[in-house]
């Protein structure tokens, strides 16, 4: 299953083996940099501090609110720090609801923010759901904030959608999948071979730079993103920093819907939205609402 995803695999022990997009690849091979390798999300404080300076995603909130009702039980797959489920718990009187994410740091933050006994944060793999989740059925299953983008191929996404369908309570239950809007991947082709740098200030007051290098595969609609942030210098004068290489499939409704149908699902509606921050700010996103066929 790891072959079909673009993140969260095992980290290489030898940082020189990580392949970054040009020109950041020169940092790895320079011989003057001592680097750490990160999964990027939640497991590296420097990247984490940068993320705190970006706009917190809310573009999928209204779509989720449109299908959630008082008394519902919700399963949020790839919940991160619980931003979506915590929001819904404030807006609705939910029954037993669960969020699951592979990051222990994200789940720790989720647990720290929970103020409801019926909201549960679980550290685990969304491809191997634990018994406390599989023994239940849910009114709404969510993949918020483009969670499915780390899935690179059709077969892997079908496995995940079939698993989500198996957790639905009845014919009135729904699955919510947040993706890019049709046409957005083509608009992102300008990012191919582009390098950007973003200044930000860390919580300790230090200024820092984060560098991004991109390679876009327009045939497979996969965006390769390499990232480097410098954290200082060591006693030998070498650069210290952290690197990560991410791959994201730019899923859209047109690409998702045939796979959903193969998974025994049908489309109820598609809700338009847009990217709130970053290089793709203002570009179209979409929330696809699915139900059992």
Region annotations inferred by a language model:
Residues 83, 88-128:
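Class I SAM-dependent methyltransferase SAM/SAH-binding core
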Residues 131-140:
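A short acidic, Gly/Pro-enriched loop at the edge of an enzyme's catalytic core
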Residues 78-80:
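Class I SAM-dependent methyltransferase "Motif I" SAM/SAH-binding loop
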Residues 139-155:
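A short SAM/SAH-binding and catalytic strip from SAM-dependent methyltransferases
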Residues 3-70, 83:
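Conserved class I S-adenosyl-L-methionine
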């Amino acid at each position: 299953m790891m072959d079909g995803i673009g993140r969260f695999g095992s980290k290489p022990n030898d940082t020189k083996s990580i392949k970054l997009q040009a020109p950041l690849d020169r940092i790895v091979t320079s011989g003057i940099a001592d680097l750490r390798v990160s999964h990027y999300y939640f497991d590296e404080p420097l990247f984490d501090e940068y993320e705190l300076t970006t706009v917190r995603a809310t573009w999928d909130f209204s779509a989720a609110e449109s299908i959630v009702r008082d008394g519902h039980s919700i399963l949020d797959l790839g919940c991160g720090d619980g931003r979506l489920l915590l929001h819904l718990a404030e807006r609705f009187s939910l029954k037993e609801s669960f969020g699951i994410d592979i990051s222990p740091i994200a789940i720790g933050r989720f647990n720290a923010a929970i103020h409801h006994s019926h909201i549960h944060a679980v550290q685990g793999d969304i491809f191997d759901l634990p018994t406390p989740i599989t023994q239940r059925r849910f009114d709404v299953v969510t993949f918020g904030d483009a969670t499915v983008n780390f899935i690179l191929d059709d077969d892997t996404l079908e496995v995940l959608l079939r698993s989500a369908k198996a957790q639905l309570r009845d014919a009135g239950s729904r699955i919510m999948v947040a993706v890019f809007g049709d046409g957005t991947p083509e608009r992102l082709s300008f990012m191919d071979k582009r390098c950007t740098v973003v200044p930000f200030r860390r919580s300790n007051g230090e200024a820092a730079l984060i560098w991004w290098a991109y390679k876009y595969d327009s045939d497979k609609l996969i965006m390769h993103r390499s990232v480097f942030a410098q954290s200082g210098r060591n006693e030998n004068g070498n650069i210290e920093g952290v690197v990560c290489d991410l791959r994201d499939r730019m899923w859209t409704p047109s690409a998702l819907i045939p796979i959903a149908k193969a998974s025994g699902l049908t489309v109820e509606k598609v809700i338009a939205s847009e990217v709130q921050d970053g290089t793709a700010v203002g570009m179209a996103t979409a929330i696809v609402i699915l139900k059992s066929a």
